[in-house]
Each structure stands twice: as C-alpha cells, then as structure tokens.
UniProtKB/Swiss-Prot annotation:
This is Cell cycle protein GpsB. Residues 69-90 are annotated as: Disordered. Gene3D superfamilies: 6.10.250.660. The gene is gpsB. Divisome component that associates with the complex late in its assembly, after the Z-ring is formed, and is dependent on DivIC and PBP2B for its recruitment to the divisome. Together with EzrA, is a key component of the system that regulates PBP1 localization during cell cycle progression. Its main role could be the removal of PBP1 from the cell pole after pole maturation is completed. Also contributes to the recruitment of PBP1 to the division complex. Not essential for septum formation. GO terms for cellular component: cytoplasm. It comes from the Bacteria.
Length: 120
C-alpha cells in the first residue's frame, strides 16, 4: 500500500490547469492524473486479492485446526471412557492369575502369600 499516490480526498479536490480560457483542461495533465489513478486502483486491486487469498488460506487453516481439536477431543474422551474398563480388566486378570498360581503351586505359595502381597 506504500505505492498509493492518492487518497479519495486528493482525487476529489484535484484542480487541473486550464490551457486556454474556454478550451478546457490541459489534456496531458488530465491524462497523467488518470494514469496515476489507474495505477493506484491496480495496486488496490492487487492488495485486495492478496488479502482475500491470505484470508481464505487462514480460514482454511483455522478449519483444519478446529478439526484436529475435535478429533483430539474425541480421542481423549474415548480414551478416558476406556480407562476405567481397562483398569478393571487388569485387576480382574491379576486376581485370576493369583488364583491360578495358588491352584497350580498349591501350598508352596500359601506360605509366601504375605511376602508376595506387594506384587498385587
């Protein structure tokens, strides 16, 4: 936007030189001014396109990040809901293993039950 030569007020208040009274404005002066106005509008249009492209890119990135947050949140909720079941399942497996060890090894474990209780 540094290449912009005129503000809307500059255009509104532009005074053209009169070449001869009654013959109108100096054509070269008017043409030069209009050339500068056209350049400004081209610069505005390019900047507007760039900003629109950037805006579209940033919106797409925000949408993608929101999807990632939703997926992460969903996975977190699933993990949290599975965790109590998993803990209960692990405890159940440990109890079964302990019962099987008692049955297989019989009295050998009964004497050492107090020493191995920290393993459960």
């Amino acid at each position: 936007m540094d290449n912009i030569k005129f503000t809307p007020q500059d255009i509104l208040h532009k005074q053209f030189k009169e070449r001869n009274i009654g013959k109108g404005y100096d054509e070269a002066d008017v043409d030069a001014f209009l050339d500068d106005v056209i350049k400004d509008y081209d610069t505005y249009n390019k900047e507007l396109e760039r900003l629109n492209d950037e805006n579209e890119r940033l919106r797409a990135k925000v949408d993608e990040l929101n999807r990632q947050v939703e997926v992460g949140s969903s996975m977190s909720n699933q993990t949290a809901s599975r965790q109590p079941v998993s803990s209960a399942t692990n405890m159940d497996i440990l109890k079964r293993l302990s019962n099987l060890e008692r049955r297989v090894f019989g009295s050998q474990l009964d004497g050492n039950d107090n020493n191995d209780s920290h393993l459960l």
